[in-house]
Amino acid sequence: MSIFFDDKILQNLPKKVKVVVGIPSYNNAETISFVSKTAAEGIVEYFDSDGIIVNADGGSKDGTKEVFMKTDTKSVPKIAYDYIGLPGKGSAMLSVIELAKNLDAEAIVFLDSDLKSVRPWWIERLTGPIMKGLSDYVTPYYVRHKYDGTITNQVCYPLVSSLFGQAIRQPIGGDFGVGKNMIDVYLKAASSVAKTEVARFGIDIWMTINAILNSNKKVYQAALGAKVHDPKDPGADLSPMFKQVVGTLFDIIVDSASKWKDIGSIEEAPIYGEIPQIAVEPININIENLKMQLLEGLKNEESKILANDHLGFIMEKKKVPLQIWVDILFNALIEYSKNKDKKLVESLVPLYFGRVADFAELTKDMNEVEAEKVIKDQINLFANKKDELIEKL
């Protein structure tokens, strides 16, 4: 009996396929056709049509499933269904993993439903290391605008790299390759996370860190070029995502401390394929809005406590410089480990806005390459706090 979908959908499916392409969606009627058509071209070209495209939908009101089913996917079969469980990306992706297990698939490719830059060769890049026996899990490696992926840049990338010892540039990138071994690992844990934030936006970080901890092969990064999608203004609409992603990340860090505390060095996760040289689309960032949200949020007592000795400086400058951000984040982790209070993660949000404001001002005259160096150099400051964190957890 499946947890995340109605077993009736299995009746019309093939008994076995080599690859499953999963597209989680919610109100993505405008973009899903392009993603599924491109995925089909990739399956035809690189898997000789031996695959299926799966649209796991969250009850879209704009006809997403219907648009998907009308799309010409050549000789590649497809299925669309409403997943079961908490509404969220995680429930959708776990339903695809369950389905892939039923179809004895050798690999899953996950693609975001709002992608505008996906190409057929992405299917090969995200599965190549798996099919060649090099890896059980492949993350995307994109060329991104310096203001795209702020939760990744300021929290997930430096924390995962410094604590878990693998520098994975896009641990929550959304477009992944998953091999058989990890399918089994995820399904073993699926019922225990079905009612948590993993069922929402916590899924990507949960999958990535589980792959680091539970696979005896390296996590690979697939060079995919630019990620062009419906970008989000950090100050406007990332607050729920921040709480779900960072809450999940904190849970995993606390629960798996015995596994990561002995990891000493940081290795760059290998990149598969040549990195295409592509110009990225500009993204607008409203720095004044971020500063306003920082000051507004600092009226909250918990946020003030997290800012601690730095409160006066932060209020005056209306931003959170890197060293202060690292101190705040690690102190929050230590505090969180005591009783896993989700309010604490929520209290980080305004300070995160202040961190993004500082980064945006610092890099405003930099090109993408220069800003990328700033992001990568942050890891050293995070790594310097690791011993202190181990002592106090």
UniProtKB/Swiss-Prot annotation:
RNA-binding is among the record's keywords: no
SUPFAM superfamilies according to UniProt: Nucleotide-diphospho-sugar transferases (SSF53448)
Requisite cofactors: Mg(2+)
Highest taxon in the source lineage: Bacteria
Pfam families from the UniProt entry: Glycos_transf_2 (PF00535)
Top-level enzyme category: transferase
Catalytic activity entry: ADP-alpha-D-glucose + (R)-glycerate = (2R)-2-O-(alpha-D-glucopyranosyl)-glycerate + ADP + H(+)
pH dependence: Optimum pH is 7.0 (at 60 degrees Celsius).
Temperature-activity profile: Optimum temperature is 70-75 degrees Celsius.
MF terms in GO: glycosyltransferase activity
Regulation: Inhibited by EDTA and Zn(2+).
Keywords on record: Glycosyltransferase, Magnesium, Transferase
Job of this protein: Involved in the biosynthesis of the compatible solute mannosylglucosylglycerate through a nonphosphorylating pathway. Catalyzes the synthesis of glucosylglycerate (GG) from ADP-glucose and D-glycerate. Can also use UDP-glucose, with lower efficiency.
Family the entry assigns: Belongs to the glycosyltransferase 2 family.
Oligomeric and partner information: Homotetramer in solution.
Protein name, entry field: Glucosylglycerate synthase
Organism whose genome encodes this protein: Petrotoga mobilis (strain DSM 10674 / SJ95)
Lineage: Bacteria, Thermotogati, Thermotogota, Thermotogae, Petrotogales
